[in-house]
Amino acid sequence: MKPAKSSPVQIARRGLMLVISSPSGAGKSTIARTLLETDKHIGLSVSVTTRPRRPSEVEGVHYHFKSVREFERLRDSDALLEWAEVHGNFYGTPREPVEQAMAEGRDMLFDIDWQGAQQLQEKMSADVVSIFVLPPTMTELQSRLHRRAEDSEEVIQTRLANSRAEIAHWREYDYVIVNDDLNTAFDAVQSIVKAERLRRDRRHGMFDFVRELLEETPSL
């Protein structure tokens, strides 16, 4: 007769704020989408933006699309954890769902730029794990933007012009990944998430677990 299989040990921990940034076309959105599809413990922090909705985007799934006036109302009432102006449009992170997720031990994914990442680091540094995704070459970055076929040529050129300034902030991130192969880059992100979830300072339930472990007296 086989011994009964014990249940997995569950140790309470605080949620993780996983920030993934990159210049447009480097692959952060694809990596983020794949991570959400394969890891049920991660939820997406849906940003608000004044940017026009692309044909492939769904309200409330990819972004909450707002007018400039609506966005300013949220910003001025301190309802946003961070906000930034990118390519002439405003982006921001709603405060309430993030703070609730952290307290409940749920991980949140942030697909935001360096300005937003910087603000999150300043406000909630203990919870933030930041990853910057680089393209293998600028030529490949340009090719990816054209293959995406969702922006006008003028917008693509603006994104390319801004990409060098964005890449200059790579040193501000905890981890940096070169996305020359999507599967390899995704595997690296998964490894980072697994390791960060095991950090001692994030697992507040470990104190009770160790105390009970030391108090346990095995029966003979």
UniProtKB/Swiss-Prot annotation:
The keyword Nucleotide-binding applies. Gene3D superfamilies: Guanylate Kinase phosphate binding domain, P-loop containing nucleotide triphosphate hydrolases. The keyword Nucleotide-binding applies. It is found in: Cytoplasm. Transmembrane segments: none annotated. It catalyses: GMP + ATP = GDP + ADP. It is an enzyme of class 2 (transferase). Its EC number is 2.7.4.8. One of its GO terms (cellular component) is cytosol. ATP binds at residues 22-29. Residues 15-194 form the Guanylate kinase-like domain. One of its GO terms (molecular function) is guanylate kinase activity. Keywords: ATP-binding, Cytoplasm, Kinase, Nucleotide-binding, Transferase. It holds the Pfam family Guanylate_kin. SUPFAM superfamilies: P-loop containing nucleoside triphosphate hydrolases. CDD domains: GMPK. Essential for recycling GMP and indirectly, cGMP. Belongs to the guanylate kinase family. HAMAP family: Guanylate_kinase. NCBIfam families: guanyl_kin. This is Guanylate kinase. It comes from Rhizobium etli (strain ATCC 51251 / DSM 11541 / JCM 21823 / NBRC 15573 / CFN 42).
